[in-house]
Amino acid sequence: MSSLHKSRIADFQDVLKEPSIALEKLRELSFSGIPCEGGLRCLCWKILLNYLPLERASWTSILAKQRELYAQFLREMIIQPGIAKANMGVSREDVTFEDHPLNPNPDSRWNTYFKDNEVLLQIDKDVRRLCPDISFFQRATDYPCLLILDPQNEFETLRKRVEQTTLKSQTVARNRSGVTNMSSPHKNSVPSSLNEYEVLPNGCEAHWEVVERILFIYAKLNPGIAYVQGMNEIVGPLYYTFATDPNSEWKEHAEADTFFCFTNLMAEIRDNFIKSLDDSQCGITYKMEKVYSTLKDKDVELYLKLQEQNIKPQFFAFRWLTLLLSQEFLLPDVIRIWDSLFADDNRFDFLLLVCCAMLMLIREQLLEGDFTVNMRLLQDYPITDVCQILQKAKELQDSK
């Protein structure tokens, strides 16, 4: 470890040990990258995402309160409905019209159950393929949720719901328009394998199952947006960071802490996932156009070239912005970018500058390429040095 790196760690420790955290100083340090040693990144993210307050003295009580609240969410939205499902229609004599699966009432328990299953199946499909370049999400967590996995419990878990649902032979997708599409697979095709569940023994669960639970709870608590594909790519790096915290006391509560940090982050970016807001000033279309207007201001030649080739920002910047660049770089590089995004006062204005910097750093290739070549460049971004990209974005910010 270099003396410079040791000095940076000491600077973070000095800020974080104060009774009242100096937020501006923490932002300044974090913007240049947060060391992963000693759980510094995990702690800084929790502060920068407004999960932990600046007053250290209140941390213990707030964490206890939030973690108990999350446990209550699990009981209300997974355990109790699971018990109700297990009990619904057990005895033919006990079945009421309200309990009947064919009850057309949209507020009936069965109708709610079926709608939840549609959301759950989409989440399940998406979280299974999280970060396929690493094995982390397929491995067992050291801290499985005992509330869910207690062998004494006799209720339908999310795992059982996915295995048993009558919709499992269908592909269910909810797009940003809020439309749910279902299509049965071809007779000869193999449905999505559920054997991944069998890899881990009873009492264990994979990290992706934890992420599935977080997203399901979020969808239940936020019915206006529920779950939209891509949210898994936002929660994944958060959970990975917290679940690999070297401090076991923090790592043990990675699920609850991730949920609340994800919720706070989504409060800032959720408009990107709502199609009806696309053309508003808070919508994704406005932000994509802002990338191009910034490019026009900083590099008019490149801007005109992209315009001439009719390369619209929707073709590439939609994914860049909506998923916070989580699909453009390897996970460690995404985490480094997020250090700067979370640390910046106007973090999602800075994201626009990062996108503009990405364009300018490959300007020569773009100026020389035709439409096909340039689309390939933009959809499979060639530069892997994220520090170079962040430095360029900071230059753009400082030159305003």
Curated annotation (Swiss-Prot):
The keyword Membrane applies. It is found in: Membrane; Cytoplasm. InterPro entries: Rab-GAP-TBC_dom, Rab-GAP_TBC_sf. Keywords: Cytoplasm, GTPase activation, Membrane. The keyword ATP-binding does not apply. Residues 35-345 form the Rab-GAP TBC domain. It holds the Pfam family RabGAP-TBC. GO terms for biological process: intracellular protein transport. It comes from the Eukaryota. One of its GO terms (molecular function) is small GTPase binding. Its main location: membrane. One of its GO terms (cellular component) is membrane. Interacts with RAB1A and RAB10; in a GTP-dependent manner. Acts as a GTPase-activating protein for RAB35. Together with RAB35 may be involved in regulation of insulin-induced glucose transporter SLC2A4/GLUT4 translocation to the plasma membrane in adipocytes. This is TBC1 domain family member 13. The lineage of its organism: Eukaryota, Metazoa, Chordata, Craniata, Vertebrata. The gene is TBC1D13.
